[in-house]
Amino acid sequence: MRKIYATGKRKTAIAKVWLTPGKGGLSINEQSLNQWLGGHEAIKMKVMQPLLLTKQEQSVDIKAVVFGGGYSAQAEALRHGISKALNAYDIAFRAILKPKGLLTRDSRVVERKKYGKRKARRSPQFSKR
């Protein structure tokens, strides 16, 4: 029984994922998916997407530790980590996950604030006279 480790990232959220062959258990920060997310069905589907695409929701156990960012970023980091772990588990899953963009790190992060500006791009109000 081999244990596969993968890391997923999105914005400032990081997900550490351990995947083992099992019966479909999903533990996030020592909680079930429903406890961790509450009633956010769209975000739950985002997390389950790689498992549903590869039809592994009943044949692998996943234990994850997620920190940083908000719920949406954490869910996308978790999805990225699960996808990378499934890819390491069976290379045949790459053909399913890659076209959906699940193995690609989303590199969009918050743009830094520049000096002389109020925010990243917002300038102070201009007065002609």
Curated annotation (Swiss-Prot):
GO cellular component labels: cytosolic small ribosomal subunit
Keywords: Ribonucleoprotein, Ribosomal protein
Pfam families membership: Ribosomal_S9
UniProt GO BP: translation
Coiled coil region boundaries: none
Any one GO MF annotation of this record: RNA binding
PANTHER family: RIBOSOMAL PROTEIN S9, SMALL RIBOSOMAL SUBUNIT PROTEIN US9M
Annotated family: Belongs to the universal ribosomal protein uS9 family.
Name of the protein: Small ribosomal subunit protein uS9
Species this chain originates from: Helicobacter pylori (strain HPAG1)
Gene assigned in the entry: rpsI
